[in-house]
């Protein structure tokens, strides 16, 4: 994981910027933590979430430290089966700059016909999901 969390500044600078069209939300700092919040909502079975976690960890590692992350894989029966990833479930992020909140909604392996619930968003997280999704 060190290769992911200790990317040298010159490598970041070479990556540059793109013209990708994406929505950016700018809001006020979270008054309880006194820092801007980054909210991640995903599910372990999802291969798109699996791919996104790598860049989230790499980017946020520039501003803080992750601990307790585990290696995982997306569902073996979904599109892009068994996509390698990290799991935020049970992990922690500490930073003097950002408040990172991760919610892993469901697991990666079917139990019967459903993926098991891992975590549930708080009321505030639900409000943000409804507002920005």
Residue ranges of each PLM-predicted region?
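Extracytoplasmic thiol/disulfide redox context detector
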Residues: 1-95
């Amino acid at each position: 994981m060190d290769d992911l969390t200790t990317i040298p500044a010159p490598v970041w600078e070479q990556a540059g910027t793109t013209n990708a069209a994406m929505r950016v939300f700018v809001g006020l700092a979270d008054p309880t933590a006194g820092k801007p919040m980054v909210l991640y909502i995903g599910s372990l079975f999802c291969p798109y979430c699996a791919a996104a976690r790598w860049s989230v960890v790499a980017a946020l590692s520039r501003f803080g430290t992750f601990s307790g992350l585990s290696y995982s894989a997306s569902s073996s029966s979904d599109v892009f089966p068994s996509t390698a990833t990290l799991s935020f479930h049970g992990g922690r992020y500490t930073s003097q700059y950002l408040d990172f909140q991760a919610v892993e909604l469901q697991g990666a392996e079917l139990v019967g016909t459903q993926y098991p619930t891992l975590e549930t968003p708080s009321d505030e997280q639900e409000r943000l999901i409804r507002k920005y999704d």
